[in-house]
Amino acid sequence: MGTTGTNDGATTPPANTSTPAVDIDVRDLGTVDYEDTWHLQANLAAQRAEEKIPDTILLLQHPPTYTAGKRTQDSDRPTNGLPVVDVDRGGRITWHGPGQLVAYPIIKLADPVDVVDYVRRLEQALIQTCEDLGLHGTGRVEGRSGVWLPAGVINGELKPARKIAAIGIRVTRGVTMHGVALNCDNTMEYYDHIVPCGLADAGVTTLTEELGRDVSVSDAYSSLAHNLVDALNGDLPVHS
């Protein structure tokens, strides 16, 4: 995904990415069933399209759940027999569960709708959250969604590029659904049974794994909430 850059690598966020520019309602849902939350999102998105509610961000965790986006291949699906929820977001298969902080922004994008700009803002919020928590060097990988750590030698071991946060969205009637998932201190066990996001040549990691100390969902919560609001309001510059 491309952006129009300035000389320092930052972009000037357009003023009309979402409306209103302020007044985003952030809701903490705790741990909630995936399908129940999916239905809640659809209900809120319909209300947002009719201007009945303000822009809203849902912050939560899910019980262990595999979800498959519209591009999921049969070969991506789990080998451990666990059920999969087929959903209407983009992307392929992923896992949600305890220790992973999930955010679902229900945002009315301004016309003309710019989905690339919206995704860039989500990525920037995640990158800044990692920085806030002491994890430096996260960024984007061309042609792949989400937030990544680059391949490299760490403690004498060659590690592949590793995804620390996933993004999958849907836009209907100009309103966003689904969103982002930041791996904090969740288990990696469930990823062993799928091809996460359809990427067989890449790894998955957590804040806890990379920082060598426990980083819980509660540790990341305030930072991610703040950075999402700032990114969506245009107060957090988007860097290429």
From Swiss-Prot:
Composition-biased stretches (Low complexity): 10-21
Location of region: Disordered: 1-22
Pathway(s) per entry: Protein modification; protein lipoylation via endogenous pathway; protein N(6)-(lipoyl)lysine from octanoyl-[acyl-carrier-protein]: step 1/2
Keyword Cytoplasm: yes
Gene3D superfamilies the record matches: Bira Bifunctional Protein, Domain 2 (3.30.930.10)
Residues at the catalytic site: C197
Binding positions for substrate per the UniProt entry: R89, G90, G91, R92, I93, T94, W95, H96, A166, I167, G168, G179, V180, A181
GO MF annotations, alphabetized: lipoyl(octanoyl) transferase activity
Domain BPL/LPL catalytic: 51-236
InterPro entries on file: aa-tRNA-synth_II/BPL/LPL, BPL_LPL_catalytic, Octanoyltransferase, Octanoyltransferase_CS
Subcellular location: Cytoplasm
Residues the UniProt record annotates as site (Lowers pKa of active site Cys): K163
Keywords, in A-Z order: Acyltransferase, Cytoplasm, Transferase
Miscellaneous comment in the UniProt entry for this protein: In the reaction, the free carboxyl group of octanoic acid is attached via an amide linkage to the epsilon-amino group of a specific lysine residue of lipoyl domains of lipoate-dependent enzymes.
Protein name, UniProt field: Octanoyltransferase
Organism from which the protein derives: Corynebacterium jeikeium (strain K411)
Gene: lipB
